[in-house]
Structures are given as C-alpha cells and as structure tokens.
From Swiss-Prot:
It holds the Pfam family Mqo. Its cofactor is FAD. The gene is mqo. InterPro entries: FAD/NAD-bd_sf (IPR036188), MQO (IPR006231). It catalyses: (S)-malate + a quinone = a quinol + oxaloacetate. Its EC number is 1.1.5.4. One of its GO terms (molecular function) is 2-hydroxyglutarate dehydrogenase activity. GO terms for biological process: tricarboxylic acid cycle. It comes from Sodalis glossinidius (strain morsitans). It is an enzyme of class 1 (oxidoreductase). The keyword Nucleotide-binding does not apply. This is Probable malate:quinone oxidoreductase. Belongs to the MQO family. Keywords: FAD, Flavoprotein, Oxidoreductase, Tricarboxylic acid cycle.
Length: 539
C-alpha cells in the first residue's frame, strides 16, 4: 500500500510538472497582455521604433478585440469633446471651464495624425472601414441648460480647436441637423444645440484587427490566443516572469520572461496589476459598471438621422452615462444606438467572472472603496434607478431625444463592461476617478492602463505617454525622436492656440482619412498666428 501511495504521488508530481513548463529562453523584449486597441497601438509604435524587438501578445479569448474594443461594446464616438458636455464644467462663479475639453481634443488630434500615418504606410487600409464623418451635436432643453450650452459655446470659441462649431436655438435649424430629434416635439419647448460637422464615428474593433494583421507579418511578433495570464512576478535580474495558461491545450501552463510588460486587459487590468506585487498598486480599486443600448436597424428610421446627439447627464450620474442617440457604422452598415442604460455586475469583463470584484479586494483598497460608497450617494441612487428601469421607462427616455420612437423598431443589447478607478486619497480616504490613468512600476518596466472614457479615442497619445515612462532612455534618443515626429508630426507641440498648426494638421489628416475639413478661422480682431513649417512634408 505504501508503494502504491508513493507511485501515485510520483504520478501527481509528474503530471503537475507536465502542466507547468518553465521556458528557459532569453527574455523577450515586451509582453502585451490583452488583444485590444491599446495593446495593438503600443505594439504598432514599438514595431516602428524598434523593428528588431521581440513582442509577445497574450489574449484570453478566441479572437482579439472582443471586449471593450468591439464595435458593439462601445459608443464608437471619436471623443474630441465637441459634443460631450461632461468635459466642460460650470464653476461656482458662473464661468465654463474648458481645460478638460481642450486636452481631450488635443489628444484626439494626435490619434488622427497617427492613424493617417498608418494609412500612408498601408498598415491601416480603407479608412472608411474604421472612421467616418458623423456630425457631433449637443442638444438641451430648459432655460438653465440652454444658458449653459450658450456659455459653453462662447467659451470654446477661445480655443482654436473648436472653431467651426455652430450654435442655434432655432428649431428649424436644429431640425435640419437632426430631424428625428425635432419631429413630434412640443413646439413650445425651448431647445438649443451645437454642431460640429467634422465629428467622427470610429470602429475600434476593425482598427484593432487591421493593426494586429499588420503586426503578424513580422516574425518577431507572436500572438497567443486563448492564453490567460495567471501570474506576474519580478525576477532578481529585474526582468518579469509571466505565467500563462493555454486554454486551447487543456490549460497547460508555461512561463515567459520579459524585459517589459504592458497590461492592457481592459477591466481585468487591475487584478493583473495586483498579481505583479508592485507597491504602486496599493490603494487602487475598481468599480465595475456595465451598459446597455437600444439599437435600431430599420432603414426608415436609420435613414432619417445622421449625427451623434449628446444630452446632459442626470445629477449624480457618472460621465459615461450621458444619454446620446448615435449614428453608428458597423460591419459596413448603419445603425442607431441610444443609451447607455447602466447595469451592475461584479464582472470586470463582459466575458469575465462574477468573482472579479471580490478577488480584487485587498486590505489596502477596501477602505478607499468603502469611502467612495459613502461619499457617492448620488451615483448609488442613479445606479439603482437604472437597474429598476422597465422597457416603458427606456422608451420614455428615448422619446426625450426621438419623440416619435416606437419600441417595435428597437432592441436592447448588452454593451461592454467598464471599471472605474478608485484610488486612495489622503483627504477623503478614497475617490472615484473618471477617465484613464497609467500606473507603472518605479523603473517603468511594467505599466498598466486603468479606467475608461475617453479610452480608445486617445489610444495614440496615451501610448506616447506610456512610451516615455516605460522606455525612458530610448525615448530621448535622436532615432526615437525623429520617428515619433514622423508618426505624429505635432509631437512636442501644443496645438491649441496655434491657428496655423490646427489647420495644417486637420487638412492633412482629413485628406488621408477621407474626412470633412473645416478651416479654423481667427475671431474678429484676432491676428492670424504664424504658420508651422514642415508639417505637410512630414505627413
């Protein structure tokens, strides 16, 4: 019996050894975790900057770009702050702060330049497959909201980035811009709208697939599908050991060593960062919020609307909850989406685990999470109200933006999961942070992107920021500086306030991407600024 026990133990140890294979090869240059637009963008940058580097990408699903990057899992708005009212806030003194809107727009201009470069390099093909002009509108009703929108419009005109925006309180003009929004509306209701004709709809799923298809042409790039990262550890030589489970091979585990690691796993990024054990993660937590959209594909409905119309968020609602009715171009076809309607799930990914939230709780982040819950009753009340909504309630919400809507034309779909960042705060104990944030190890060799909106629209500038933190020595070299300026001609420049630079960039990228160009003109009495030389040559 003793011999049988020893034999059985030996078989168990042997089986365990077979299940986990330690790869004793030289470290790869970088591991990208997650097959979405962020990892694809970083991989594309690095392949241009260091063609000889070895890059391994690990994606847990059968296909890439199936979570937040998928076109049906996000709003597809090219976030440029043209229509999103939450990027401009009203101060107690009554003035409108446009600093966030300017920053978001500058970031989107960087993305446009990067995409235009990739089209010229034939890395991205057929721009209309991933980006199309759809005018961006803000639409409000009620005296207070109209006053705010007028103030916002006036404030934005001080920025060269928002020249060409139109404002109207004339119902007939607004009907020409967005007939579905006005048809059937109470004629006595006072309304106002702004419109930016150069707004865009972006299919980030299609873009990601094209970027990865180009990367796979290089022998140094290796894409591993159905590979789940289960652990990340720091080695004595300051490299990283990344343990992965191959679910296409019975969960067989192996360990790969890397000099650098980027975690771009969407909602799952927080728990992956926690596995690394770096002290910088202490105090970070995540609050998952899901979303649903009403979708219409009836040509008679879809054909009468060509705009992304954003309203004003409810009091206490998170920025990502701003109601909007959008023209979307997905899989080559037009559709209308209205929402989002918030949902709650403890999953950090749409195809994640119900235990994600609970697995992310630690002694360091439990207090910040509890403080956020206590300090955000408005958000909690909003979420509860959303969860209790009936089909009739959703139809009534839709009719605020499309008065003649009938439920027969619409169906409800589940969008992607977003995980809002919660971080420790010395004063409040914990704060809920909207937007995205890069968190890195002290030496920058491991970095992660946390958060949500504006997200994919600003992938190019976010990855530029990450390049500077991960590759501190390389980014200052002449070779990298030249290449970065080739890929993003305004790199190192401030676009806002430079009328000539604004127009040069927009004209060049519009021509390459097949988009509408609107000249930014000086205000009355404002001198035209100097022309930035060399942009067209660089583009």
């Amino acid at each position: 019996m003793k011999e049988n026990f020893i034999a059985a133990l030996g078989m168990t140890v042997s089986a365990s050894a077979k299940q986990h294979q330690v790869v004793d090869n030289p470290p790869v240059d970088i591991i990208l975790i997650g097959g979405g637009v962020m990892s694809a963008t970083l991989g594309t940058y690095l392949k241009a900057l260091e063609p000889g580097w070895t890059i391994h990408m690990y994606e847990r699903l059968e296909k890439t770009a199936e979570e937040s990057s998928n076109g049906w899992n996000n709003a597809g708005t090219g976030h440029a702050a043209f229509c999103e009212l939450n990027y401009t806030t009203l101060s107690p003194a009554g003035s409108v702060d446009i600093s966030k809107a300017v920053a978001v727009n500058e970031s989107f201009e960087i993305s446009r330049q990067f995409w235009a470069y990739l089209v010229k390099q034939k890395i991205l093909t057929n721009p209309q497959s991933f980006i199309n002009n759809v005018p961006h509108m803000s639409f409000v009703w009620g005296e207070d909201n109209i006053r705010f929108l007028r103030q916002r419009f006036d404030a934005l005109q001080t920025s060269t980035l928002f020249r060409g925006m139109e404002y109207s309180e004339n119902p007939q003009q607004i009907r020409e811009w967005a007939p579905l929004v006005m048809d059937g509306r109470d004629t006595f209701q006072k309304v106002a709208a702004t419109r930016m004709a150069m707004g865009t709809d972006v299919n980030f799923g299609e873009m990601t697939q094209q970027l990865l298809a180009a990367l796979q042409q290089y022998p140094q790039f290796h894409l591993h599908l159905q590979h789940d990262v289960v652990d990340i550890k720091r080695n004595a030589d300051q490299t990283w050991s990344v343990r992965v489970a191959d679910h296409s091979n019975g969960g067989r585990q192996s360990t790969v060593c890397a000099r650098h690691v980027f975690i771009g796993g969407g909602g799952a990024s927080l728990t992956l960062l926690q596995k690394s054990g770096i002290p910088e993660v202490n105090g970070y937590a995540g609050f998952p919020v899901g979303g649903q959209f009403l979708v219409a594909t009836n040509p008679e409905v879809v054909g009468h609307h060509h705009a992304k119309v954003y309203g004003k968020a409810s009091v206490g609602a998170p920025p990502m909850s701003v109601p909007h009715i959008d023209t979307r171009i997905l899989d080559g076809k037009q559709a209308l989406l209205f929402g989002p309607f918030a949902t709650f799930s403890s999953k950090f990914l749409k195809r994640g685990s119900w235990l994600d939230l609970f697995h992310s709780l630690t002694r360091q982040n439990l207090l910040p999470m509890l403080r956020v819950g206590l300090d955000n009753f408005g958000l909690m009340r909003y979420l509860i109200g959303q969860l209790l909504m009936s089909d009739k309630d959703r139809l009534n919400a839709l009719r605020e933006y499309y008065p003649q809507a009938t439920m027969a034309d619409w169906s409800l779909i589940e969008a992607g999961q977003r995980v809002q960042v919660i971080k420790k705060d010395a004063g409040k104990g914990g704060i809920l942070q909207f937007g995205t944030e890069v968190v890195s190890s002290a030496d920058g060799s491991l970095s992660v992107l946390l958060g949500a909106s504006p997200g994919a629209s600003t992938a190019a500038p976010i990855m530029l920021e990450l390049l500077a933190s991960m590759f501190k020595e390389q980014v200052t070299t002449d070779a990298w500086q030249r290449k970065l300026k080739e890929m993003v001609p305004s790199y190192g420049q401030t676009i806002n306030g430079n009328l000539a630079l604004t127009n040069e960039i927009r004209l060049s990228t519009s021509e390459v991407l097949g988009l509408t160009y609107i000249e930014a003109k000086p205000l009355p009495g404002e001198p035209a600024d100097g022309k930035w030389e060399g942009l067209q040559k660089a583009m």
